[in-house]
Amino acid sequence: MKTIIALSYIFCLVFAQDLPGNDNSTATLCLGHHAVPNGTLVKTITNDQIEVTNATELVQSSSTGKICDNPHRILDGINCTLIDALLGDPHCDGFQNEKWDLFVERSKAFSNCYPYDVPDYASLRSLVASSGTLEFINEGFNWTGVTQNGGSRACKRGPDNGFFSRLNWLYKSGSTYPVQNVTMPNNDNSDKLYIWGVHHPSTDKEQTDLYVQASGKVTVSTKRSQQTVIPNVGSRPWVRGLSSRVSIYWTIVKPGDILVINSNGNLIAPRGYFKMRTGKSSIMRSDAPIGTCSSECITPNGSIPNDKPFQNVNKITYGACPKYVKQNTLKLATGMRNVPEKQTRGIFGAIAGFIENGWEGMIDGWYGFRHQNSEGTGQAADLKSTQAAIDQINGKLNRVIEKTNEKFHQIEKEFSEVEGRIQDLEKYVEDTKIDLWSYNAELLVALENQHTIDLTDSEMNKLFEKTRRQLRENAEDMGNGCFKIYHKCDNACIGSIRNGTYDHDVYRDEALNNRFQIKGVELKSGYKDWILWISFAISCFLLCVVLLGFIMWACQKGNIRCNICI
């Protein structure tokens, strides 16, 4: 009996395939868009996480691990700091007259000469680094009545006591140290950088032994500036066997100006000047090795590609670099909203449009058509709407780079002026710049992502409206991105709808006739499917009852024998 009921149910399902609407006089056309099984989450103005078919990472988060030697000229400081190379520390003599785009200072660098300090070390370091050269020109200063070329055991040059090669230590000659008053005009067309110093003896005896006077004084002047330094005699921590010190100063002499040096002792005199050049040279502290490669952007961690607008490798950079932001990732949508395709579409494999889900496997376009007609099913991309979306999305990455560079360069220039005037605010300003860059970057990417999603949705709607205008009353909008076409529409007919050559008048009469022709139960209400399935269920139930009644009647008449065993 159970077998008979099951066969009856299957019989009903088989006949259900001949429901009204599945005959050859109608067709279904659905519009849809590309989808992928696993999309990428991006952020928009209205949504923190929205899935798209494709996205591009905008933040460079790793370096090559080495500093590329091309296209920038890299000068490896090895064991020397830039200031030691500038002064002429004996172990840095190999850097004399060198040039660079980027001077790389190493953590292992050390000084190996007379202990010194620079009152404004960072400014001098930055000044020389930006000049990009250690080119030095000797000048004939006229020092009279004193002994020149003083040296120290703390600054060996070979086996002999020495001193910084770019400086001239003056001390008494015999028992006198006459006042020195020397001038040196700048008749060149470029600025001259003079490095000079003041010696601070550790004891009063050392002071008089070297300079006779109990207290010396050094004054260096130009038409624009004057510096006066009085030595501080006193013991300091021992460095390389000495408790005395040298303080290093510098003076820039403009073209047409004149350098005046006046001293009655303790003067560490210049031997000449360094040529000052304007350019984009710089300095960086890094222990990354220098390798044979090419990269426009260098960080202390190593070189990084500059094909992304942002990076979070290091806030210190040199060259054409992405802007530093706090975010580890910022994804730019380069595809449409992703709605993965449902894997099952009911018993009979119905097709659905873009309102329900996207379509996977559309490799030849972003938008397209699927149809179901008397010749079967098929799918084709709509290249025109696809190209319209791609044309507007192409170049989006370049537009983001342009926008960020323009905005951030303005901020950078503005804050650079503040940093130069107010040293106490330097760290605060740097943090503020990074906060602004990070906020602007996130906002800009969210705006672009919102535009991309709105754009791709708009192209889908345009294609749907274009199809609706072609079909008019020949088809019915099914509400899921599909149209039910009320006339026979073979593959050629479907193709004419796709390419925009469909003639609605040709099929108008047939479509109207089919719309109003009653075939079984053809209801327009939203309860159509429910009523159809209920009617089939009742029919199947009645069939089962009839069969069961026949079997019971046959058993009573003796035509069928039924044995029940326990």
Swiss-Prot record:
Can you tell me which residues are glycosylated? Answer: 24, 38, 54, 79, 142, 181, 301, 499
Record-linked SUPFAM superfamilies: Influenza hemagglutinin (stalk), Viral protein domain
Q: List the disulfide bonds.
A: 30-482, 68-293, 80-92, 113-155, 297-321, 489-493
- Show which residues form the site (Cleavage): 345-346
Recorded GO CC terms: host cell plasma membrane; membrane; viral envelope; virion membrane
Q: Which UniProt keywords apply?
A: Clathrin- and caveolin-independent endocytosis of virus by host, Clathrin-mediated endocytosis of virus by host, Disulfide bond, Fusion of virus membrane with host endosomal membrane, Fusion of virus membrane with host membrane, Glycoprotein, Hemagglutinin, Host cell membrane, Host membrane, Host-virus interaction, Lipoprotein, Membrane, Palmitate, Signal, Transmembrane, Transmembrane helix, Viral attachment to host cell, Viral envelope protein, Viral penetration into host cytoplasm, Virion, Virus endocytosis by host, Virus entry into host cell
Q: What domain of life does the native source organism fall in?
A: Viruses
Q: Where in the cell is it found?
A: Virion membrane; Host apical cell membrane
Q: How does it sit in the membrane?
A: Single-pass type I membrane protein
Extracellular-side stretches of the chain, per the record, are 17-530
Q: What does the PTM comment of the record read?
A: Palmitoylated.
MF term (GO), any: host cell surface receptor binding
GO BP annotations of the record are: clathrin-dependent endocytosis of virus by host cell; fusion of virus membrane with host endosome membrane; fusion of virus membrane with host plasma membrane; viral budding from plasma membrane; virion attachment to host cell
One Pfam family matching this protein: Hemagglutinin
Lipid sites, type S-palmitoyl cysteine: 555, 562, 565
Q: Does the keyword Membrane apply?
A: yes
Give the residue range of the signal peptide: 1-16
Function description: Binds to sialic acid-containing receptors on the cell surface, bringing about the attachment of the virus particle to the cell. This attachment induces virion internalization either through clathrin-dependent endocytosis or through clathrin- and caveolin-independent pathway. Plays a major role in the determination of host range restriction and virulence. Class I viral fusion protein. Responsible for penetration of the virus into the cell cytoplasm by mediating the fusion of the membrane of the endocytosed virus particle with the endosomal membrane.
The entry's family comment says:
Belongs to the influenza viruses hemagglutinin family.
Protein name in UniProt: Hemagglutinin
